[in-house]
Structures are given as structure tokens and as C-alpha cells.
Amino acid sequence: MAAYILVVDDDPDIRSLLRLHLASAGYEVGLAEDAIQAGYMVLARAPELIVTDVRMPYMDGFEFVAALRADNALPYIPVIFLTSVDDGDHRGRELGAVGYLLKPIRADRLLALVAQNVPGGPVPIG
């Protein structure tokens, strides 16, 4: 069974691109357009890893991860933060992020970081 990764980004093009990269590498991918939708998805099925944008409407990525970390009923879920602004990764590291990637996303960096932090990894394709 492929590792399940949840992608959270308000930009549909970014969501599609990340799904393409991750699914092509053999991961199962869930997509959420904001942190509110992602929260419901996590409660329904906890992913092995979350890739989330920092700047989103309603609730930013930092607030989303802080809410996850505050819920003791949820398992620890590794998080990779995405941002288009190089404003440092201090807040993300405080929340226990395993990585911080600048947009535009390089597929090789994304996949390497995911592989380092997902138990079980992808399912071989073909």
C-alpha cells in the first residue's frame, strides 16, 4: 500500500503539479484547497506526511499545523512547508517541520524530502 500524502495549497495549479510529482513517484495523494478542508481530511484519514503552503486564506499553514500538534488524539504527522517568500523557516521549525521548500518547487528536492520522512515510501510503478 502506498504512503498517503496530503497536499494543502490554495493554488489549484500548485496542487495539480504536486499531485503529478508525488503520484508519479508512487505515492497516494489527497488534495485540500485550504486548512479547513485539510483538517477534516486529516480527521477522516491521517496521512503519513503533509505538504502545506504557508500563506493561505482563512487559516495559514502555521496555524493549521499548530492546531494539528495541539490535538493529542492525532498521531505525529511530518510536515513540509511551501512558500513563495523566503522569510525563513523559524516558525516552521518551531512546529516540528521536517522541511521547508521555496516555490517554484523542484521535483527532485520535493521527492527527496518526502522519501526521507515517509515510512513505507512509495509503491513501485509498473
Predicted regions and their residues:
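Receiver (REC) domain active-site loop signature in two-component systems and cognate sites
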Residues: 56
